[in-house]
Amino acid sequence: MSRSFFATVLGLALAAMTVMAAPADAKSRIKDIVAFEGVRDNQLIGYGIVVGLNGSGDSLRNAPMTKQSLEAMLERQGVNVRDGNLNTKNTAAVMVTANLPPFSAAGARMDVTVSTLGDAKSLLGGTLLVTALQGADGQTYAVAQGSVQTGSVSAGGASGSSVTKGVPTAGRIAAGGIIEKETGFQMVSMDVLRMTLRNPDFTTSRRIADVINGRFPGCAQAQNPTIVAVRPPAGMDMISFVTAIENLEVEPDAPAKVIIDEVAGVIVMGDDVRISQVAIAQGNLTISVQENPAVSQPTPFSRGGQTVVVPQSAVSIEEEKGKKLLTLGGGASLKSLIGGLNALGVTPRDMISILQAIKASGALQAEIEVM
């Protein structure tokens, strides 16, 4: 990654954070930073069979579960194949998963995901047969069926070589699931509703309670950094109350944190990161070892002479010049840090090491989280 590109990225990041620092944009709606109790997806799972594959399905010899499932399915259709020798590669055993949205009504549709279990090469062109989807309680909440879309492309030549783009062993069926049973959650009958902060914080929790109490006195209580409990005022049901408070705006707070992805060389940090007085020096040391073997031959007409390879090594050590010492005063901001490191020509991967060293020295007033 070139330094000019790094400087451009840093400039855009600083510009974005400068805009975000405006008070009007710092506030968020309550419904964007909390999750309401009971308003969540429920995960469903089922076992099924995909048919219609063009020779890319399970080999029944290596996938006995597929053979057993196929025989059982055909017997339910009145076809007896127990005494026959099934030898098809057009079917595949799959797991079907889906998320049941909150407040879903019977008859509504949802997307489902299909993934192979056996040694099938691709689900491209296959059709999932009707499959029951169950929840963690073992009850059936939906059924799924339909054509599987993998989003992958495969091409092969006569020599046997092939190229595949995407993952052909997993796919989706858009609106392939039909909800048969509702979860039974009734928010309207609740007396107290708990809201869970997506990013737990004492200050944010208190601010949410204060904003709600400013509109509906005595109706909200911050129980901890994660939970804010609310109770609708007299004469108002829970649905109407939630509708009234979810659009109230709050300025969320969060502890200073630096997120580092060492594999990709990505660094993300907020504008509230502060650094105590510290001096930083960074330089690059390059060690180069080159092997230039030479051939040694005996003189003409000599006896007992042999041609041998003589190793010749060239070792050089080069230290990059021109680096200066960067000094940051106490309370230095993110802008000062990035500007100073950019002036030193520091790459993102070097910055990761520098930030970790600053944290180890006790000068970085933020938490470092390595992904």
Curated annotation (Swiss-Prot):
GO terms for molecular function: structural molecule activity. InterPro entries: Flag_FlgI (IPR001782). Residues 1-21 form the signal peptide. One of its GO terms (cellular component) is bacterial-type flagellum basal body, distal rod, P ring. Belongs to the FlgI family. Assembles around the rod to form the L-ring and probably protects the motor/basal body from shearing forces during rotation. This is Flagellar P-ring protein. It comes from Caulobacter sp. (strain K31).
